Structures are given as structure tokens and as C-alpha cells.
Design a protein with these regions (language model features):
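A short, solvent-exposed loop/turn motif at the edges and junctions
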Residues: 68-80
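Aromatic- and Gly/Pro-enriched, solvent-exposed loop/edge beta-strand patches characteristic
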Residues: 165-243
């Protein structure tokens, strides 16, 4: 019998829930007034977060504190909240692109990252039955020993029953102790995942040139969107009529350590397995 491993909810400190929470709703735009898609919104130190829609809309329940708005193409935004708000407009400023870096010399095509040994019969899943897994993140750790230019990011989804599923790939440089995860992307990487009970293999070639300096990196897979109308229809369906795998996405599990984020902007936690991301490209000699 196939084992389904669902990554479990991490308990938040009880003190978070002792504070009064209230709803904040709004829209996120750029300096031209155009919507900014899939912004991570929340309070990182409390582990509270969500992801805005493709239209930049967001809704979150928080205590009085400062909301943060994170997107790889924009400077981090901050907004203090102390009362409910139904019509908040957040304007994000575009980040400046770093100067191009050119490295001479010979290159060798190779894999920077491979999954490890597969945990046969086990799968890891994302659950969108309540829309709560938007922002959940898991991936793999890679070590670049020499400068490395990423050309392909590969992963497999074994089945997906989440309509409108969009995933995001992120790349973080790991620095310091305690570990700090710094997102090095300047352009987002998204992929649409079709509804299918069959295997789907993805080979993503980033639009921007991603040159890794020697060091440790966390390459992650995150759910950022799903069809909320489908979520509502699922919730209205009697439990006896639901398919056990409806509104769920599954991947294989591999024996190689990684990190896991329960929700958008929550802290990253060590886990002993990963979901099988591979990275290949050119290593400079």
C-alpha cells in the first residue's frame, strides 16, 4: 500500500494566539499602479503569512504589528497595522538589477544538485482544501564549490488534483550561524501544473542568468496559487462524495536533507528528506 506523507503543521507559540487578530485586506501594485502578483505578505517573526493573488489581492488576519511585503523583483514593503482594514493599497518599488557579471575560462556541464535515494512508496503532498498551503515551501540544499551558472531546474509532480495550480521556484544563499536564507533571484520563476493523475516532468530554464558564487544554497518549490472557486466548491461537497486526493498535489520523497517552511514568511525548519529537485548547468573551471 502506498504511503502518503503529508508534511505536518508546525505548532506556533501560544503567545501568538493570545493577541487579538483582525482582518486586513488590500491590493498590491507597482509604481505604475499595475498589480504585483504572488507577493508574500505577513509578519515573519510571528510565522504569519499568505500569498497575494495574481491580481495582487490579499487577505490576512494579524495582530497589531508591521506587515511585510516580499517579492524578488521589488524592494521589501512595510506597513504598520493596528485596526481592521478592508481597502489597503500597498505600492512596491522595483528593485535595481545588479550589474552583469562575466567570468572567463573554461566551463564544464554538470549537475549541481541531484535528489538522492528515493523513498520507495512514499510521497510528499501539498493540500489546498482550505487554500492554506499557499506559501508552503520545501526544497533541497546544494553546495557550489566553484562559480556555477544555472541552466535547468528539474522536478517531477507525480499527481495533481489542484485546479489552477501555480508553483514558484526560489533560490536562497545560506549564510551565517544561525543560518540566514537570502533570496538571490531578481525575476520570479513560475510554472503552471495541470490537473492530472499522471506524472508530469518539468524542466525550467530561468529567464535571468543565475550565477552562483561558491557556497551553500537552498533551491525550493512553493505553492503560490490555486483556483479558489474550486476550493469553495470542494468545501461545499459532502465529505462522502469527495475523492481522497482532490485538491492535493504529490511528489516523490528522497533521502537527502532539506528545509521546510509551513506557510509564507514562516521560519525554515530542517527536515531529513526532499522532493527531488535537480539543478544542472555550467561549472567554471
Amino acid at each position: 500500500m502506498r504511503i502518503r506523507l503529508i508534511l505536518t503543521l508546525l505548532l506556533l507559540p501560544a503567545c501568538i494566539y493570545a493577541q487579538e487578530h483582525f482582518p486586513v485586506r488590500g491590493r498590491i501594485v507597482d509604481e505604475k499602479g499595475e498589480a504585483v502578483e504572488y507577493v508574500h505578505v505577513g509578519i515573519p517573526r510571528l510565522g504569519i503569512g499568505t500569498v497575494s493573488t495574481v491580481d495582487g489581492l490579499f487577505e490576512i488576519e494579524v495582530p497589531a504589528d508591521t506587515l511585510e511585503f516580499h517579492h524578488v523583483s521589488y524592494q521589501t514593503g512595510y506597513y504598520p497595522v493596528s485596526t481592521p482594514d478592508n481597502d489597503l493599497v500597498i505600492v512596491l518599488k522595483e528593485s535595481e538589477l545588479p550589474p552583469a557579471v562575466f567570468i572567463g575560462g573554461d566551463t564544464k556541464e554538470k549537475y549541481l544538485l541531484r535528489p538522492g535515494t528515493r523513498f520507495v512508496g512514499a510521497q510528499g503532498g501539498f493540500n489546498a482544501r482550505d487554500g492554506i498551503d499557499k506559501g508552503k515551501e520545501v526544497g533541497s540544499v546544494a553546495k557550489a564549490r566553484k562559480p556555477f551558472l544555472i541552466k535547468d531546474i528539474l522536478f517531477t509532480v507525480t499527481s495533481n488534483r489542484i485546479p489552477g495550480c501555480v508553483i514558484s521556484i526560489n533560490i536562497y544563499r545560506i549564510e551565517g550561524e544561525p543560518k540566514e536564507f537570502i533570496n538571490i533571484l531578481h525575476k520570479p520563476i513560475y510554472a503552471d501544473v495541470a490537473v492530472s493523475d499522471g506524472r508530469q516532468d518539468f524542466d525550467i530554464r530561468p529567464e535571468e542568468s543565475i550565477l552562483l558564487e561558491p557556497g551553500n544554497y537552498f533551491i525550493s518549490f512553493s505553492l503560490v496559487d490555486c483556483d479558489m472557486d474550486a476550493v469553495r466548491m470542494f468545501q461545499e461537497t459532502p465529505e462522502s462524495e469527495r475523492n481522497p486526493t482532490d485538491m492535493e498535489l504529490y511528489t516523490n520523497i528522497y533521502f537527502k536533507s532539506s528545509y521546510y517552511r509551513e506557510s509564507s514568511l514562516a521560519g525554515l525548519e530542517y527536515i531529513p528528506v526532499n522532493i527531488g529537485i535537480s539543478v544542472k548547468g555550467l561549472e567554471y573551471q
